[in-house]
Structures are given as C-alpha cells and as structure tokens.
C-alpha cells in the first residue's frame, strides 16, 4: 500500500517540497503512506547498518474545503472544453459505508490493537529462511486477491463493492486486510480512480466506462505483510490513458531489473525516470516504496525519481517498488478525509507495485501471480 504507497514524510532536505505550490500545511493520518528524502543512510558501503535517530514523518499538502472542491470541479470542466488531452469527468466523493468487521480469531497487526499510528521503522527487514517462506505466502495471497479484484472492475460496479469482495476473500484465507484501521483508514483496500494518485477510499461511486483504477492490496498473514497494486481499465478506455498505464508498468519492471545484492538504491529512481521521460510522463516524487515484512512500513525508502541518496541493497531484504506516473502535473490536493490524494490539474495518474526479495544475483518478485 503506497502508496504507499503507503509512507509519508517531510524532511528539511531541499530536494523535495511536497505540493510546493500550496502554502498550507497540515498533519494527516496518511503520513505513513507518503515519502520524502532520506537524510542519512541505513547502510554503509560495506553493507552494514548505520545507526541514526528515527525521523519524524508528516505530509505537506493542500487540504481542500467543500467550496474549493466545487471550484476545482468547475475548472476541470472548463479544461475539458479547451484541452486536446481527454479528461474524464472530475472525481466526486461518494458515501463511505461503515467499517467491515474481522473475525476475532484472525491475528491483527500491532497498530490495530494499539490504535496508534506507527512510526516508520528504521530497521531493514531481512526475514531469514522461515520469514521468507511466510513472506512468500502473504505476497502470494495478496497477488491472488488483486487478480480477483481486477475481475470486478466493470461499469456500474462501486469501489465499495470491490472493497467488500476483497475484504471477504482476505478473511476467508485467515488473513487481515492491512490497510483497515491503519492510522484511521476506514477500508480494507485502496481504490484510486483517474486523477486520484493514491489512497482512494472505496465508496458508493459507480465506476464508469473510460475510468482507470488502481487497486492496492495488502494482507497480513502469519505475522507478515504482502503488498501489491495494479492499474486496471474499466470498459472502453482512451488510448492515451492506456499508454500511460503501459509505461507505468514498464517503469516498475525497469526499476526491479536493477535490483540485486550490492546494487545502489538510487539506480531504481534513475531507471524509472529515464523511461517515463522518454514518453513525456512525470514521476510523482511524494510517494515512495518501503521496506515490508513483519512491519508494514520501514526503511529502506525507495525513491522512484533521480536522486543521490546513498545506500546499498542486501541479500534477503524485502521492499516494495511502486512508481506513480502522471500525464500532467505532479502537484496534489488532498480531500478532507485526509487520505484521498488527487493531481492538482485533474490529469490522470497510474501506479503499479510489487514486493520484491533481494537475492545474490538479482531479485525475486514475491507478488507475481
């Protein structure tokens, strides 16, 4: 989950300014789904961990009121008549149904019981043989759930119905839907439609032919999280949108291709940026990949854009890569629910995500089904 991915932060580094065209700042529960630059490396050049103090994470973004949202929709409609780039109708909030229940016998991640939003763990997650077997099981389940969710994407289906189906499949497998209750997130999956970059909350809005939708699934099984997402087409989709989605998936593949024991993390962002720019798309810098395993979000933070951050991959590490590409701006606005994050200009966004395991000669995609 990204989205985060699902990580968030705001550091003093000048290399990243979250939603920098906006003046207001606010603290949001979604801070554990967004990312900002690492100010110190967790690994030395020898591959050993360096010690440092945990960073404080928060999001800096424009939180829109009801009036501002109405103005945004009006401006988007005006753009529809002037722009040569096709735009779907502006995304509108639907009704969010009550939180679904999870049977008592299913183990919960620690953050659910405590009710406290966890900090980003500074520990790299290297599970070991037994842990890797459990990671494979969690990731395989997440991949199967995501495949099933994709079959439900049709015109007139609501994202709330997709959430219910995903929730039921996860608990039937004896697992817990990791997003549910994370920092107050009210649903079991993220559904991000059209201009929604990430962290869309499932609601009563019906999908329409021409929509694209990212579904982000994370499951907690036997003490380990498996995290993956994919962007799907609903009905007849514009060729320009299809191209964006194709290139985004290719960016993920190219980022994964550079991963192996001893490789530099910054190679991921370089490879993704090169491919996106070749087609004229923009890479969102605010959302990062992250370590995943027994802990939902941890170091290393994976930047999907060009960067000079130090750090080397180590055999046995597990983390996500989850680039988001946009047709237009990468600036964002966040709805009052403190989660749903949209492109500021209404341009569509696409995202793909895998959890990978670093090996001596390359990497293994754990969420490939």
From Swiss-Prot:
EC number: 3.4.11.18
Cofactor descriptive note: Binds 2 divalent metal cations per subunit. Has a high-affinity and a low affinity metal-binding site. The true nature of the physiological cofactor is under debate. The enzyme is active with cobalt, zinc, manganese or divalent iron ions. Most likely, methionine aminopeptidases function as mononuclear Fe(2+)-metalloproteases under physiological conditions, and the catalytically relevant metal-binding site has been assigned to the histidine-containing high-affinity site.
Binding positions (a divalent metal cation 1): 216, 227, 353
Catalytic activity: Release of N-terminal amino acids, preferentially methionine, from peptides and arylamides
Locations listed in the record: Plastid, Chloroplast
InterPro entries: Creatinase/aminopeptidase-like, Pept_M24, Pept_M24_MAP, Pept_M24A_MAP1
PROSITE patterns on file: MAP_1
Transit peptide, UniProt annotation: 1-61
Biological process according to GO: N-terminal protein amino acid modification; proteolysis
One Gene Ontology term, aspect cellular component: chloroplast
Pfam family membership, one: Peptidase_M24
Tissue spec: Ubiquitous. Preferentially expressed in green tissues.
Gene3D superfamilies: Creatinase/methionine aminopeptidase superfamily (3.90.230.10)
Cofactor: Co(2+); Zn(2+); Mn(2+); Fe(2+)
Free-text function comment from the UniProt entry: Removes the N-terminal methionine from nascent proteins. The N-terminal methionine is often cleaved when the second residue in the primary sequence is small and uncharged (Met-Ala-, Cys, Gly, Pro, Ser, Thr, or Val).
Assigned protein family: Belongs to the peptidase M24A family. Methionine aminopeptidase type 1 subfamily.
HAMAP family: MetAP_1
Record-given protein name: Methionine aminopeptidase 1B, chloroplastic
Origin organism lineage: Eukaryota, Viridiplantae, Streptophyta, Embryophyta, Tracheophyta
């Amino acid at each position: 989950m990204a989205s985060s991915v699902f990580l968030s932060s705001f550091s003093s580094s000048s290399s990243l300014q979250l939603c920098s065209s906006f003046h207001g700042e606010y603290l949001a529960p979604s801070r554990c789904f967004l990312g900002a630059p690492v100010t110190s490396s967790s690994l030395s050049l020898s591959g050993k961990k360096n010690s440092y103090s945990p960073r404080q994470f928060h999001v800096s973004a424009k939180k829109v009121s009801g009036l501002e949202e109405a103005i945004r929709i009006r401006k988007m409609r005006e753009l529809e008549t002037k722009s040569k780039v096709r735009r779907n109708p502006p995304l509108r909030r639907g009704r969010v149904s009550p939180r679904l229940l999870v049977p008592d016998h299913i183990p919960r991640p620690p953050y659910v019981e405590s009710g406290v939003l966890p900090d980003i763990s500074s520990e790299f997650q290297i599970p070991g043989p037994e842990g890797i077997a459990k990671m494979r099981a969690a990731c395989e389940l997440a991949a199967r759930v995501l495949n099933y969710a994709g079959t439900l994407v049709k015109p007139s289906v609501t994202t709330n119905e997709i959430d219910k189906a995903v929730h039921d499949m996860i608990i039937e497998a004896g697992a817990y839907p990791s997003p549910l209750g994370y920092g107050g997130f009210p649903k079991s999956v993220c559904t991000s439609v059209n201009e929604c970059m990430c962290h869309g909350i499932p609601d009563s809005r019906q999908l329409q032919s021409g929509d694209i939708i990212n579904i982000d699934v994370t499951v907690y099984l036997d003490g380990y999280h498996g995290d993956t997402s994919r962007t799907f087409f609903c009905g007849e989709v514009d060729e320009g949108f299809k191209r964006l989605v194709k290139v985004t998936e290719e960016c993920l593949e190219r980022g994964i291709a550079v991963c192996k024991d001893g490789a530099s993390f910054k190679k991921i962002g370089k490879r993704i940026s090169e491919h996106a720019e070749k087609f004229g798309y923009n890479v969102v810098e605010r959302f990062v990949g992250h370590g995943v395993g027994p802990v939902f979000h941890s170091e290393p933070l994976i930047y999907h854009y060009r960067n000079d951050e130090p750090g080397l991959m180590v055999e046995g590490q597990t983390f996500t890569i989850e680039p988001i590409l946009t047709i237009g701006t990468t600036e964002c606005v966040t709805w009052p629910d403190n989660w749903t994050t949209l492109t500021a200009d209404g341009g569509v966004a696409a995202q793909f995500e895998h959890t990978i395991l670093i090996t001596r000669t390359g990497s293994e995609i754990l969420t490939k089904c």
